[in-house]
């Protein structure tokens, strides 16, 4: 397989030393995109508030919260991948300019093209009225396109600008020195929201400025880099797996307890228990060296960014059909999830046959 440069976590990645794909990272990336599609399927069929969920059967409510929480693991996995692949590299002045030109600018161009396509789609299918001024605001990244998944793109574009600087800084610092600020910032960024999820009336706030560390999402990248540097390598996989499940069940318990009290709590990425579960899960993926039916998984991994960009318009159209059908909600969720995955994969496969178009629309390099 031809060698490809390290790119965004959704992107095609190769091991620089062996010139082969890293199996564990392909597993992580493929699972991550499946989880992202799952959470979007849940959010677009269920109304995730206390009134609506508590009016449903216990089974349907538990199904919704489990799938929702599973889906929330997708974005952390992508961010860990970015940190794992991009922060443990040597950046010279020349390579920094190359990174900005090929990686950052390429991602920006792809994002802008999709913003235009999304706005045209929303108008063509009567989801919103056309507004040239609104399109301009969307393209300037001062307003989010009316598609729930697009919050991610401005965030990762902003983070990407500083990746070379962060990588160069980390190269000159021993791991034991990095631990203190990383642990301190993480305790505030993730710990306080986790505390408030258990005690909703707590007045606790995160007052320490985390901007220099990249905020919550920058910390995800740093922890991904820390896994690359051997975090958890001396801990048995069974222990890590048990802790992964325990933290995930803790998040579920908090959500279910909140809904039982009539309070809607839908976990976000700043929750320490969710972040910890995702980090441990990622460290397990990294240990995978081979797997069954790797060709299909490899294709899904390589095209995960394209699927991410393509899936939401398909989801919006298929959702309209499913909403009027008298089927159980869990069945609708599974159908929506699989149908969106299928349509997105087919569109990716077609676009992939036109390399220049794929370069722009799918960010293929």
Functional labels for PLM-detected ranges:
Residues 60, 68-77, 88-123, 127-145, ...:
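Transmembrane alpha-helical segments and their boundary/interface "anchor" motifs
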Residues 63-75, 140-155, 193-220, 254-280:
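Interfacial loop-to-helix transition and helix-capping segments at the boundaries
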Residues 80, 84-88, 159, 163-167, ...:
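Hydrophobic transmembrane alpha-helices
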Residues 23-88, 108-111, 115:
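Functionally critical transmembrane alpha-helices in membrane proteins and complexes, commonly lining
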Residues 160-187, 225-245:
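Solvent-exposed interhelical
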Residues 2-8, 15, 289-301, 312-365:
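C-terminal "closing" transmembrane helix and its immediate cytosolic amphipathic cap
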Residues 34, 38-41, 115-116, 182-196, ...:
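Aromatic-anchored segments of alpha-helical transmembrane domains
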Residues 214-215, 232-298, 329-331:
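Alpha-helical transmembrane segments and terminal signal-anchor/GPI-anchor hydrophobic tails
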